[in-house]
Structure formats: structure tokens, C-alpha cells
């Protein structure tokens, strides 16, 4: 184990996979000479050269399509979106082509592509650069969607994503890039896609969160422990396919569930989780499932308004207390 | 299996080798007959969804494929039956696909607009206008990445030219010197909208020039006068160039939707099969049985 930042963990994953497999290459805006808008690809051009670290002009649809075409005939591209908000420009390529080629060609062609970059609320980046983009992708059959919370997950899940034979949407976070954590240096270390993790054991209530919301929920759990509430924290890590088994298992244990997500709540992750928990574990629930979500508005710029838009510790704590108080607790 | 003309050594211009001329005619006739049968089955309700026929444009696919090697790639939009047949796909498996059968090329999951055949390097079958052009650049990038000497032919219609991805793809292919041949089948109508109503520059080949891609306009109805992809073009692209071609072609059938009406302008365009000159002079020295030539004329 080594202690490193989330950014360094991603860089290590890219480097190891590029060393392991000559078909893996990186393509996107500023990934080479500039070494990445957020320095995730730092040093890759120097080690692997311009053949495998391809700088593109600003044309998300074009270079995503290039990645898909290259993947159809045997390469394994890692496409960087400078921020995932820009992936909307390539949404047609991702949804209509990458996600569907394997199916609509009757299995003749597959698209082993990873599309990665930061997304979600950051630091006053305002309406067009702060969206929780996962919702746009996890609805689509044929796509896998990953949101890695810790440096260790960032490395292990990115490596699995690159090794996957089908398209993976891998959304990081600007605010997590400098976060430090323990990361295995073993080049064979991977975390399988579709596996949730219990980050904190508890018995009174299950809280599901990922990315920045998980760090916030962790603080809430520590605070509430002082009040005698025992919170179990589950991080899905992969949103599609979702590890429903781990989530249901936790709900059967605690009988209460709160889902926290940074994005707007309507038809969000929390809606889906509440739905399958109700379908599969209705009799285990002692209280209605609660969702703590971002406000139903674009992200404002002003710092105080930005804070109002995203789920706060207070809101999370209040939801946890409500579900624990329901039905006599 | 369909006969492919892919392995023939083509000689550009009017001095077309009679053997090649015969194969070109065979490919064109195969496409014409396939499409006529598909139209019949569509009318009978045995083929569903959209059916975009290639009738009237056969010379482009036949001519272009004649200059390719079997291991070269072809990628197309949704009026792709002819490109897929010319590349050498099994017409029975293609028709099975149109019928939605499990023995179809894509196991019945793709249909008319999503024909793929990995065994002949036919990469589809893409039904969002313009979206497959960046894919072609990606295939070109992979060829260059691996240091191979294949080329990819990218067929598209005049309707794709107004899309941003046309320009993004040409820019990237030119910038990175990718072995892509862009072949525009300009039948002058994107569904019901004429190029005059859609493009500020209707000389489509000039867009290629803008990106520094050697480009030219050819007559897509003159299969032997100017083969759609001449061997010298292919070899130049193989050696690291790019190439753009805009073919004038005539689509005889209207668009692919049930109940699609042909506008007057569309209805009045022709749909004859261009018979290669050496064969058109039949029976004087073409070596072709009478039947072949006469059937071709019948199709005119």
C-alpha cells in the first residue's frame, strides 16, 4: 500500500494498463502535451509517445466517435472528457453507437471503450460545469456506469473498466482529485465492476451515498453515533450494473434506508434504489425510504447558493433522524 | 455466396477489362435484384420498419469495392444494402436479417439499417445521419496505430454534409493523415430536401479540399468511365493519404418510410443500371452471353 491522491491513483491505473496492453491508448483534449486539464494523464505522453496519447481538437462527438471506431477494430481507447458536462455533445455517439453496436450487430462487434472525466458539483463552477451526469447514462442498456469515491476505488475500478469488453462511463470528481488515501501498488489489483462496498457497519439505518456525498455522510454518521444512532454506509461504486444484493442485504439488517445524491432528485439514483428496495424488501422496511437530493434547479454560481443547492450535512442528518424516529424507532 | 469484385485488378477509364466489366455488371445486377425482392417483401409486409433501397446507385458500390482488397474496411449509413452486398456478404443472410430472422447477419436484431458482416470487414449499418463518419476516422486511426496498410471506405449521403460530424471527421482524418476514403453518394436529396435547400456549397467535393483532402467529383452513374475508387486512389490512401469523392447518383426509390411519397423532383430522376461500356457494345467481342446484356438493358 502507498498513500497517494485520487488523481495519482487514476494516473497509476492508466500507466499500468498501458504497460500491460499495447492496444490501450488515451485520447482527448489536452491529454498529451498539456498533461491533462486536471493532470490525470501527467507523464503519459513522455512514457508512451503521441501514438498512444492522442491530443485532439475540441470536438467531443468527433473524438468519441474516433474512439468507438478504433474499438470496433481491436483497440481499447480511454477517452477523456475534460469535464463530463461536455459528454452531452457526444451523447449520440455514446448512446446510439457505443452502447448499441454489440447488440445490433448480433454480437459481431463490441466496443471496449472507457469514457472518463470529472463530473458533479465542484467549487463554484456554475450551471454548465457542475452536473451529476451519471443520470444521463445509467438509463441506457449497454452502458456500465462507475463513480469511484476513494483513491483505491479510482485505481481498481478504472483498471477493471479498461479491461471490460464493453463501454464503461467512468465519472470522477474535480473536488476528489486531491483527496489522499491508501492504494495498492500491485499492478494486478483490480476491483470488479458491479460490486458495492459497506464503508461503515451499523445497525439502525442504511445510508447509500457515493463520491463527495459519501464523505459528507461519513461525517454525519460519526456525529450521529454520539447520539446513539448506528449508521451503516453503503457505496454502490458501480451504478450500472448495481449491486442490489449488497444493498438489499443491508436494508434487511437495518430496516431503514436513506439515499443521498448530489444531482436533482426527479428520476434520479435514489428513485431507482427506492424502487427496487420496495419491490424486493418491502416487508423488511420499518419506515419509508428517504431521499436527500440536490435541489430541483441548475447549479448557481454564488458560494452560499451553491451550498443551498447540494445536500448538506444537516439535511442528511435530519433525514436519518426522521427514518429512525418513524414507527417508534 | 455472392460473387465479390474485390479481388479484381481494375483499370481506370474506358479501357475496362472485360472480365472486370462482367463482374461489375454482376454485382450491380445482384444489388438490383436483391433490392427489387426486398421491395416486394416490404409491400407484402414481410419486412418491417424502414427500408432504404439502393436502386439507382448500384454503380457506386460496385465500382468502389472493385478497387478494394478483401481486408479493407467499408462503413456506411442506413442505405447500405448495396455496400454490404458489394463487399461480399451472403445475400441470403442479408435477406434473412431484413426478415428479422435469427439466421440473419445480425441475428434479426439489426434489420435493414444495421447490417454488419465481420467476415468481410463490413462495419455497418448506422442510422444516425453523419454519426458513422467519426467512426471511419477511428478505423483509420486503428489501421495507422497498428502499422497496417488497409484503407477504410466511408459511404455517406449528401444529407450528412450539413452535420457537424462530417466536418469533425474530415478535419481529424486530414490532421492525422488517416487512410480514409470519404465517398459521398450525392443523390441531391436528403429525404425531401434538395442540396440547394440544405447546403450553402452544393459542390460537396470542395469541402474535402478545404480540409486538405484530395477531392474530386465523379459521375456515379458511369461505372467504367470513372470507377468510384480507382486503384491509384486506393494506393495513395494506403500510403498515408486521404481521399474525398462526391458521386452524383440517382436514387429511384423514395425514402424508407411506409407511405413515403416521392416528390415530383424525386420521381423524375432516373434509375437505369449503367452497363459497363465493354459490355454495352455486346455482342461484338465482349465475350458475354447475350442474356447478361439484355437483362441489364431490361433493368434500365
Task: Locate predicted features.
Chain A
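Thiamine diphosphate
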Residues: 1-167, 171, 175, 307, ...
Amino acid at each position: 500500500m502507498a498513500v497517494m491522491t485520487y488523481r495519482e491513483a487514476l494516473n497509476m491505473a492508466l500507466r499500468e494498463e498501458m504497460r500491460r496492453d499495447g492496444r490501450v491508448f488515451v485520447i482527448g483534449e489536452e491529454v498529451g502535451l498539456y498533461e491533462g486539464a486536471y493532470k490525470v494523464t501527467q507523464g503519459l505522453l513522455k512514457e508512451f509517445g503521441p501514438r498512444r496519447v492522442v491530443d485532439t481538437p475540441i470536438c467531443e462527438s468527433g473524438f468519441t466517435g474516433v474512439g468507438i471506431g478504433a474499438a470496433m477494430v481491436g483497440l481499447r481507447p480511454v477517452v477523456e472528457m475534460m469535464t463530463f458536462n461536455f459528454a452531452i455533445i457526444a451523447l449520440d455517439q455514446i448512446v446510439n453507437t457505443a452502447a448499441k453496436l454489440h447488440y445490433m450487430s448480433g454480437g459481431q462487434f463490441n466496443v471496449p471503450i472507457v469514457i472518463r472525466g470529472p463530473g458533479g458539483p465542484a467549487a463554484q463552477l456554475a450551471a454548465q460545469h457542475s452536473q451529476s451526469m451519471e443520470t444521463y447514462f445509467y438509463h441506457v442498456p449497454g452502458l456500465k456506469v462507475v463513480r469511484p469515491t476513494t483513491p483505491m476505488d479510482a485505481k481498481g475500478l478504472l483498471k477493471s473498466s479498461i479491461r471490460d469488453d464493453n463501454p464503461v462511463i467512468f465519472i470522477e470528481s474535480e473536488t476528489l482529485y486531491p483527496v489522499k488515501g491508501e492504494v495498492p501498488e500491485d499492478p494486478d489489483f483490480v476491483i470488479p465492476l458491479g460490486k458495492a462496498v459497506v464503508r461503515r457497519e451499523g445497525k439502525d439505518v442504511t445510508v447509500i451515498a457515493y463520491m463527495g456525498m459519501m464523505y459528507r455522510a461519513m461525517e454525519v454518521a460519526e456525529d450521529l453515533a454520539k447520539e446513539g444512532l448506528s449508521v451503516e454506509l453503503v457505496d454502490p461504486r458501480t451504478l450500472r450494473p448495481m449491486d442490489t444484493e449488497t444493498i438489499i442485504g443491508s436494508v434487511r439488517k437495518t430496516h431503514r434506508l436513506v439515499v443521498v445524491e448530489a444531482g436533482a432528485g426527479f428520476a434520479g439514483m435514489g428513485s431507482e434504489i427506492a424502487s427496487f428496495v420496495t419491490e424486493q424488501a418491502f416487508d423488511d422496511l420499518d419506515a419509508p425510504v428517504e431521499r436527500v437530493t440536490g435541489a430541483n434547479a441548475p447549479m448557481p454560481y454564488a458560494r452560499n447558493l451553491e451550498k443551498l443547492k447540494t445536500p448538506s450535512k444537516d439535511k442528511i442528518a435530519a433525514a436519518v433522524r426522521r427514518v429512525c424516529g418513524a414507527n417508534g424507532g | 455466396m455472392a460473387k465479390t469484385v474485390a479481388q479484381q485488378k481494375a483499370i481506370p477509364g474506358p479501357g475496362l477489362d472485360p472480365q472486370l466489366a462482367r463482374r461489375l455488371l454482376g454485382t450491380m445486377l445482384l444489388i438490383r435484384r436483391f433490392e427489387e425482392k426486398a421491395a416486394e417483401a416490404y409491400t407484402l409486409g414481410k419486412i418491417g420498419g424502414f427500408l432504404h433501397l439502393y436502386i439507382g446507385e448500384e454503380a457506386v458500390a460496385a465500382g468502389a469495392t472493385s478497387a478494394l482488397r478483401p481486408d479493407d474496411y467499408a462503413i456506411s449509413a442506413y442505405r447500405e444494402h448495396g455496400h454490404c452486398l458489394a463487399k461480399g456478404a451472403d445475400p441470403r443472410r442479408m435477406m434473412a436479417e431484413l426478415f428479422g430472422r435469427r439466421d440473419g447477419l445480425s441475428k434479426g436484431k439489426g434489420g435493414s439499417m444495421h447490417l454488419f458482416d465481420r467476415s468481410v470487414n463490413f462495419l455497418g449499418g448506422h442510422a444516425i445521419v453523419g454519426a458513422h463518419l467519426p467512426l471511419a476516422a477511428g478505423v483509420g486511426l486503428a489501421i495507422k496505430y497498428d502499422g497496417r496498410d488497409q484503407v477504410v471506405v466511408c459511404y455517406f449521403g449528401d444529407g450528412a454534409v450539413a452535420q457537424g460530424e462530417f466536418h469533425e471527421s474530415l478535419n481529424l482524418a486530414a490532421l492525422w493523415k488517416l487512410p480514409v476514403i470519404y465517398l459521398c453518394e450525392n443523390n441531391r436529396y436528403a429525404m425531401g430536401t434538395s442540396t440547394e435547400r440544405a447546403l450553402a456549397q452544393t459542390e460537396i467535393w470542395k469541402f474535402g479540399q478545404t480540409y486538405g483532402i484530395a477531392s474530386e467529383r465523379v459521375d456515379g452513374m458511369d461505372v467504367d468511365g470513372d470507377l468510384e475508387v480507382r486503384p491509384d486512389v486506393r494506393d495513395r490512401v494506403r500510403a498515408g493519404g486521404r481521399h474525398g469523392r462526391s458521386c452524383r447518383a440517382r436514387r429511384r426509390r423514395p425514402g424508407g418510410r411506409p407511405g413515403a411519397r416521392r416528390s415530383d423532383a424525386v420521381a423524375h430522376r432516373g434509375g437505369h443500371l449503367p452497363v459497363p461500356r465493354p459490355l454495352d457494345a455486346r455482342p461484338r467481342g465482349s465475350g458475354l452471353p447475350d442474356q447478361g446484356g439484355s437483362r441489364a438493358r431490361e433493368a434500365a
